[in-house]
């Protein structure tokens, strides 16, 4: 549901933009986007210990899912793992 609302708002924003504005923005984005995305991917694709302090928005538009798992087969200790997921 959140994803569909995002796309609707995204397309509305594009529909109201001036073509000259989009051309200028595309040039700027092409220069900075690969570096920003590469840095974000490296920091976001990691296991987390909690979903708090997700200030980089790594999981958007997905959600952060956490669960507990045992450390090893013969151990009763558990550790918390978190990951960004679509479901």
Curated annotation (Swiss-Prot):
GO terms for cellular component: extracellular region. Keywords: Calcium channel impairing toxin, Disulfide bond, Ion channel impairing toxin, Knottin, Neurotoxin, Secreted, Signal, Toxin, Voltage-gated calcium channel impairing toxin. The keyword Nucleotide-binding does not apply. Disulfide bonds join 44-59, 51-64, 58-84, 66-82. Its main location: secreted. Residues 18-40 form a propeptide. It is found in: Secreted. According to the nomenclature proposed by King and colleagues (2008), 'Gsp(267)' comes from the species name 'Geolycosa sp (strain A267TDLS2-KZARNA)'. This species has been reclassified since that study, as indicated in the work of Oparin and colleagues (2016). Modulates Cav2.1/CACNA1A voltage-gated calcium channels (P/Q-type currents) in rat cerebellar Purkinje cells and hippocampal CA1-CA3 neurons. At saturating concentrations (>10 nM) decelerates activation kinetics and slightly increases peak amplitude without affecting deactivation kinetics. In vivo, does not cause death when intravenously injected into mice. In rat models, through its activity on Cav2.1/CACNA1A, has an ameliorative effect on memory defects provoked by hyperstimulation of N-methyl-D-aspartate receptors (NMDARs) in the hippocampus. The presence of a 'disulfide through disulfide knot' structurally defines this protein as a knottin. This is Omega-lycotoxin-Am1c.
